[in-house]
């Protein structure tokens, strides 16, 4: 569930319910994309949570903490987690203090070049890309270990003006292009 493209209406919408005495109440319907309306277990990854607008963050925080969204409660066997970048990366990912205080934050690290090559061998990455990784191991450095962004042209660095950088995702995309390069028309 990509938070960067969602607003509150993509999470829940109100449904005004009437009862026999003329009174009413509001029930909130969830977006079917979430899958919680089926009363079956779901695995829900809330991607780019830190970039979501505040209303979306708050609605999804209830899902993360109380396992409820709109008028629905998640199936007890459901798994929900969120991803975001580090605030220090300077790409707009910020967790409000009230959310950060309630969530368990697990920081994952970039793979080493050895780990990525092992993964690549087992996942059909083009040998040319694997060789490039072996010869350019500094592409796997963490920006926090690079004091001067000009020392490493391959990694994202918040103090750099570079628009392009190497990530495991971009390496996998390069591999996909390498596999079809013979089929691409040069014209």
How would you label these PLM feature ranges?
Residues 1-135:
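AAA+ P-loop NTPase catalytic core and its hallmark functional loops
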Residues 120-187:
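Conserved AAA+ ATPase small/helical "lid" subdomain
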């Amino acid at each position: 569930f990509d938070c960067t493209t969602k607003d509150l209406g993509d999470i829940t919408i109100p449904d005004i319910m009437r009862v026999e005495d003329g009174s009413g109440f509001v029930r909130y319907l969830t977006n079917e994309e979430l899958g919680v309306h089926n009363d079956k277990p779901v695995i829900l990854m809330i991607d780019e949570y830190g970039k979501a607008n505040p209303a979306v963050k708050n609605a999804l925080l209830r899902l993360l903490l109380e396992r409820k969204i709109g008028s629905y409660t998640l199936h007890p066997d459901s798994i929900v987690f969120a991803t975001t970048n580090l605030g220090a990366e300077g790409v707009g990912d910020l967790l409000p203090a009230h959310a950060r205080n309630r969530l368990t934050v697990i920081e994952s690290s970039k793979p080493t070049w050895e780990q990525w090559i092992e993964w690549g061998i087992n996942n059909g990455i083009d040998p040319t890309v694997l060789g490039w990784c072996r010869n350019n191991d500094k592409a796997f450095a963490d920006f926090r270990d690079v004091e001067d962004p000009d020392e490493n042209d391959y990694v994202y660095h918040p103090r750099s003006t570079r628009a392009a950088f190497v990530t495991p995702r971009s390496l996998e995309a390069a591999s996909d292009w390498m596999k079809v390069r013979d089929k691409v028309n040069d014209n």
